[in-house]
Amino acid sequence: MICAVYKSLRKADSYLFVEKRNEFERVPEALMAMFGEPQLVMMLPIDKRDHLGFADIKKVKAELKDKGFYLQLPPPVVNLLEQHKKDIGFNPE
């Protein structure tokens, strides 16, 4: 299977994988509205891949088969200062 990968111009580091190029019929309208105008990044031969950057390849393949799309969102931003305070047991109260 070769899937199409699109990036969002509205949401940084957000990618939408669909089964075929320019076929968004199975993607919910609300998601497309939030995602904005999709910009094609690449056509990806997903069957020949063992892994992807940030996404679980098995989950991507399963969701493409079941839902017709997979949405990859960026990992949550970690506040390093707050994490450090927590690690050292700092409590301002």
Curated annotation (Swiss-Prot):
Signal peptide: none
Highest taxon, organism lineage: Bacteria
InterPro entries reported for this sequence: YcgL-like_sf, YcgL_dom
One Pfam family recorded for the sequence: YcgL
Domain YcgL: 1-85
Protein name in the entry: YcgL domain-containing protein swp_2294
